[in-house]
Amino acid sequence: MGGLPTLRIEPVPLERKVRPGDDLAELIAESAELEEGDVLAIAHTVVSKAEGALISLDEIEPSPFAKTLAERTGKDPRVVEVILREAESIVRVGPDFIITEVRGGMVCANAGVDESNAPPGYVIVLPEDPDRSARELRRRLRELVGVDVGVIITDTQGRPFREGVVGVAIGASGVPVLADRRGDRDLYGRELKITIVALGDLLASAAELVMGQADEGTPAVIFRGLKPELERFEGPRKARAIIRSPSRDIFR
């Protein structure tokens, strides 16, 4: 992508665990020195916690259909019931997963319902509107520290035909999530015809290397030095733009 700038990725360990109702921007501002042009990548789990998107399994009564799916997938029937409530539709069911479409059109495993990093007896669900959450976090950070930063909300997803999970951007504000390279030239002068780079997902995956997936306790990172590169692109600034339309989805 041309002459790449020097890039730094700095972890942002928060001072304490996030609780429902917390001002997440305030916690971040207390834990990190933000600069103009930084990009903040933050795990959706802490965004969801701050927004109160925690569900107590003790309050869930599984439906007969949830119990049937639980038998097929080996999952807790209460977790399956939460998945069904969060999903717009079911795409596929496997021996240990339920592939779903959720609000906004994103296709993911188990409707994004997360048991990891949730308090015992609870599950975390996705933010109601991750792009809106990113936009509000960006606005609040600008209000608190007086600098404009990009924000990406991350999750991890599997991919068809590939083992393992990678980071993806499920919410964004102030960052081009797609870089259209069509019309650029390769090393031999040939015009690129179809290359569109998923910048949001690339940043989310890089962030996951620093955040970790277990008990590392680093729910956010700062990218510093990206501003000159990102200013080259005029792509969409919402993560929803990364979602492929059903008419172009060859896997359903």
From Swiss-Prot:
It catalyses: oxidized coenzyme F420-0 + GTP + L-glutamate = oxidized coenzyme F420-1 + GDP + phosphate + H(+); oxidized coenzyme F420-1 + GTP + L-glutamate = oxidized coenzyme F420-2 + GDP + phosphate + H(+). Belongs to the CofE family. GO terms for biological process: F420-0 metabolic process. Keywords: GTP-binding, Ligase, Magnesium, Manganese, Metal-binding, Nucleotide-binding, Potassium. Its cofactor is Mg(2+); Mn(2+); K(+). GTP binds at residues 12-15, 44-45, 49, 117, 211-218. Its EC number is 6.3.2.31, 6.3.2.34. GO terms for molecular function: coenzyme F420-0:L-glutamate ligase activity; coenzyme F420-1:gamma-L-glutamate ligase activity; GTP binding; metal ion binding. It comes from Methanopyrus kandleri (strain AV19 / DSM 6324 / JCM 9639 / NBRC 100938). Binds 2 divalent metal cations per subunit. The ions could be magnesium and/or manganese. Monovalent cation. The ion could be potassium. SUPFAM superfamilies: CofE-like. Catalyzes the GTP-dependent successive addition of two or more gamma-linked L-glutamates to the L-lactyl phosphodiester of 7,8-didemethyl-8-hydroxy-5-deazariboflavin (F420-0) to form coenzyme F420-0-glutamyl-glutamate (F420-2) or polyglutamated F420 derivatives. A divalent metal cation 1 binds at residues 114, 155. A divalent metal cation 2 binds at residues 156, 213. This is Coenzyme F420:L-glutamate ligase. Homodimer. It comes from the Archaea. The keyword RNA-binding does not apply. Pfam families: F420_ligase. Pathway: Cofactor biosynthesis; coenzyme F420 biosynthesis.
